[in-house]
Regions:
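Extracellular/periplasmic bilobal clamshell ligand-binding domains
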Residues: 102-115
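Short beta-strand scaffold positions
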Residues: 74-76
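Residues that mark the start of a beta-strand
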Residues: 70-72, 115-117
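Structural signal for the C-terminal ends of transmembrane alpha-helices
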Residues: 1-7
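Membrane-proximal, lumen/periplasm-facing interface regions of secretory-pathway glyco-
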Residues: 9-69, 78-94, 100-103, 120-128, ...
Length: 170
């Protein structure tokens, strides 16, 4: 009885390790190849895909703004702020995280965004009604894009200008 119990444990271990390896290989293959088509806006890649393209689009929008005021990018979510800062490194634009709570960005960012022309990333999953909640001389849409994998939308971004940002409406 003891021998068959050890054999059962050994076989269970082999099966569990085998299933884990197959699952891991499938997950890595999907991550590298993106061969599974997910429903629109339900992709597991939405938090990691498209930031390079969004940074390039924001750079183009910033270049088209001829205002004499300083220009910067802005987001309202700290996790998105980290990604935008990283993918913006080749372009060198300032990024402000306006998430209305105390976090690490309040320590790292000593400059105030007041007086800047801020270009907000408004994505399908993280956006702010700039006109309604922020004090700006004017608000305008600078463009946008859909991010797709295998013909299915992963995320959408709209670039929204807040010209001469003066804070949050009370």
């Amino acid at each position: 009885m003891l021998i068959s119990s050890k054999k059962w444990h050994k076989n269970f271990l082999y099966v569990a390790v085998g299933i884990s390896l197959v699952g891991m290989l499938l997950a890595y293959a999907e991550l590298a190849g993106k061969f599974i088509r997910f429903p629109e806006y339900n992709s597991p890649f939405r938090d990691i895909y498209g930031y390079r393209e969004m940074a390039a689009g924001a750079h183009d929008a910033l270049q088209k703004n001829n205002s004499p005021r300083p220009k910067a990018l802005a987001v309202t979510n700290w996790t998105m702020g980290s990604r935008v800062m990283y993918y913006n490194l080749p372009y060198g634009h300032e990024v402000f995280v306006l998430d209305f709570r105390q976090d690490q960005f309040d320590i790292w960012q000593t400059k105030s965004p007041e007086g800047y022309d801020l270009l907000f990333y408004n994505t399908k999953f993280e956006n702010i009604d700039v006109q309604r909640f922020l004090l700006c001389d004017s608000v305008s849409v600078a463009g946008g894009m859909d991010l797709t994998i295998n013909g299915s939308k992963v995320n959408s971004v709209e670039y929204v200008w807040c010209h001469n940002y003066q804070g949050v409406k009370k």
